[in-house]
Amino acid sequence: MDALSPKKQPIALYPGTFDPVTLGHLDIIRRGARIFDHLIIAVAENPGKSPLFSSEERASMIRHEISRLENPTKSRIEVIIYNSLLMDCVESQGASVILRGLRAVADFEYEYQMAGMNQQINNKIETVFLMADSVLQPVASRLVKEIAFYNGNITPFVPPYVVQKLQEAVTRKKSFQD
């Protein structure tokens, strides 16, 4: 390749449970889409977790939020659902980068270990970490769900559409518990 010819940016895959998608996730998505030509948001169907929302509901919420982004950003983002080993998903999508967001040191330890395991599986796939915006560092889907369950204010943590969907889901869950 000629030194002056433009280098093609790799395809990146941003995996997660996104139960629900938070402003922190959306920040990583926006920033990742600025860095990579194509960003695939991969919504995990994780048998080890009991999500509040189905994988299709989670993907739908992400698609809704992406539709609100400006072009060309939103045209470079795709949302998929996967239920396989992450590295199999990465390879099947033609991605060469796994994008991950980091909030704190505890995230780093876990993500570093995962990146190491993924490197052992396929050393051609790189993991790129983006630090969470300092305002969004404490935001975690798990905590947002807990706050919503106790009727707390979740508007600083998730977009309005997700607030509505989360309130509906919590109401359904509470009605089943009664």
Curated annotation (Swiss-Prot):
Location(s), subcellular: Cytoplasm
Entry's Gene Ontology BP terms: coenzyme A biosynthetic process
Any one GO MF annotation of this record: ATP binding
Catalytic activity of the protein: (R)-4'-phosphopantetheine + ATP + H(+) = 3'-dephospho-CoA + diphosphate
EC numbers for this chain: 2.7.7.3
Gene Ontology cellular-component annotations: cytoplasm
Main location: cytoplasm
Keywords: ATP-binding, Coenzyme A biosynthesis, Cytoplasm, Magnesium, Nucleotide-binding, Nucleotidyltransferase, Transferase
HAMAP family cross-referenced by the UniProt entry: PPAT_bact
Residues marked Transition state stabilizer (site): H25
Function, as annotated: Reversibly transfers an adenylyl group from ATP to 4'-phosphopantetheine, yielding dephospho-CoA (dPCoA) and pyrophosphate.
Cofactor(s) required, per the database record: Mg(2+)
Name listed for the protein in its UniProt record: Phosphopantetheine adenylyltransferase
Family from the record: Belongs to the bacterial CoaD family.
Domain of life of the organism encoding this protein: Bacteria
Associated pathway: Cofactor biosynthesis; coenzyme A biosynthesis; CoA from (R)-pantothenate: step 4/5
Residues the record lists as binding substrate: T17, K49, L86, R100
